[in-house]
C-alpha cells in the first residue's frame, strides 16, 4: 500500500491507497514543531480504528509547501513504517513539462494539480484550488504546465477583515441565500462568498481567453464543494486532486516509465 502525505500551510493530510482506491484520509493542523513520534502516536491510532495495517504500507510519498516540516515527516516514515519516502521535488520524473520563467519557484502542490488533472481528465485544463491561497493552474493542449494565477484564500480574507475592522465578527464562510444582506453577518457572508465567486469566474474567463482551446475547469481543495455550487463554470469537482497527483507521481517513480498521451487520458464523462 501507498501512504501519501500532503503538507500544506494550514493542514497536513495523510491518505492510504491500496492500488485501487483510497482507504482513508486523516487531517492534522500544520505545526512546524511536531515530531515524528507525535505523528506516529496520532496516525497509527487512527489506522487501528479503521483497520489499516501499517505493516502493509510499502511505499510513501511526501509533497509539501512547508519545507521545515519535511524532516520529521521523513523520519516518521523511516522509523515508524520502515519506508524511505519519495519527496515531490525536482529530482523525480514528473512527466510534465513546465513552461514558467523559474520552475524552482513553482509549488509542488500546483504542479501536482496540473499532473493529476491532465492524467485524469485530459488537456487543456484549468485547476482552481481553494486552499490557504486560491490558485489557478493551467495546462495547455500539449499537456504542458504553463502557469496560472494566485489569489489570497477565502479564510485569509476573513482573518484580515476581522483584524482590520475590530467591530466586524470573525465568521465562517457559507453560501448566503441573498446577495443583499440586511445585517452585518449576512452582508459579510455575501461579500465573501459572492465576491470570491466573482473573482473565480473573472479569472477563469480571462485565462480561458488566453488559451489555445476551451479548457476543462476543475475545482479542488477543501472549499471546492462549496464554491463549485456557486458558479456553472466548473466541469469537474475533484476535492482530492493533489492526493491523486502524489499517487500518480509515486507510481511513475516506482513502477515502469509512463509517458503522456491524450488518448490515455480520461475525458469528462468517460
Curated annotation (Swiss-Prot):
Substrate binds at residues 107-110, 184. Keywords: ATP-binding, Coenzyme A biosynthesis, Cytoplasm, Kinase, Metal-binding, Nucleotide-binding, Potassium, Transferase. Pathway: Cofactor biosynthesis; coenzyme A biosynthesis; CoA from (R)-pantothenate: step 1/5. The active site is at 109 (proton acceptor). ATP binds at residues 6-13, 132. Its main location: cytoplasm. A monovalent cation. Ammonium or potassium. It holds the Pfam family Pan_kinase. One of its GO terms (cellular component) is cytoplasm. It catalyses: (R)-pantothenate + ATP = (R)-4'-phosphopantothenate + ADP + H(+). It is found in: Cytoplasm. K(+) binds at residue 129. Its cofactor is NH4(+); K(+). Its EC number is 2.7.1.33. GO terms for biological process: coenzyme A biosynthetic process. GO terms for molecular function: ATP binding; metal ion binding; pantothenate kinase activity. InterPro entries: ATPase_NBD (IPR043129), Type_III_PanK (IPR004619). It is an enzyme of class 2 (transferase). Homodimer. Catalyzes the phosphorylation of pantothenate (Pan), the first step in CoA biosynthesis. Belongs to the type III pantothenate kinase family. PANTHER family: TYPE III PANTOTHENATE KINASE. This is Type III pantothenate kinase. The gene is coaX.
Amino acid at each position: 500500500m501507498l501512504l501519501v502525505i500532503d503538507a500544506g500551510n494550514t493542514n497536513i493530510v495523510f491518505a492510504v491507497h491500496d492500488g485501487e482506491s483510497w482507504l482513508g484520509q486523516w487531517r492534522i493542523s500544520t505545526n512546524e514543531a511536531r515530531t515524528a513520534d507525535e505523528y506516529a502516536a496520532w496516525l497509527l491510532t487512527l489506522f487501528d480504528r479503521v483497520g489499516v495495517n501499517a505493516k502493509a504500507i510499502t511505499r510513501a510519498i511526501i509533497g509539501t509547501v512547508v519545507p521545515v516540516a519535511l524532516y520529521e515527516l521523513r523520519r516518521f516514515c523511516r522509523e515508524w513504517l520502515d519506508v524511505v519516502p519519495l519527496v515531490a521535488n525536482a529530482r523525480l520524473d514528473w512527466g510534465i513539462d513546465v513552461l514558467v520563467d523559474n520552475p524552482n519557484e513553482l509549488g509542488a502542490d500546483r504542479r501536482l494539480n496540473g499532473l493529476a488533472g491532465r492524467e485524469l481528465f485530459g488537456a487543456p485544463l484549468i485547476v482552481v484550488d481553494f486552499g490557504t491561497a486560491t490558485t489557478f493552474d493551467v495546462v495547455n493542449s500539449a499537456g504542458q504546465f504553463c502557469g496560472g494565477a494566485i489569489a489570497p484564500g477565502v479564510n485569509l480574507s476573513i482573518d484580515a477583515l476581522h483584524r482590520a475592522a475590530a467591530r466586524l465578527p470573525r465568521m465562517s464562510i457559507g453560501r448566503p441565500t441573498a446577495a443583499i444582506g440586511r445585517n452585518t453577518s449576512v452582508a459579510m457572508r455575501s461579500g465573501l462568498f459572492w465576491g470570491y465567486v466573482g473573482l473565480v469566474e473573472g479569472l477563469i474567463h480571462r485565462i480561458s481567453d488566453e488559451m489555445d482551446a476551451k479548457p476543462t475547469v476543475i475545482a479542488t481543495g477543501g472549499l471546492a464543494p462549496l464554491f463549485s455550487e456557486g458558479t456553472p463554470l466548473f466541469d469537474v469537482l475533484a476535492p482530492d486532486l493533489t492526493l491523486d497527483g502524489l499517487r500518480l507521481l509515486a507510481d511513475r517513480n516506482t513502477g515502469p516509465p509512463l509517458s503522456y498521451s491524450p488518448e490515455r487520458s480520461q475525458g469528462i464523462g468517460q
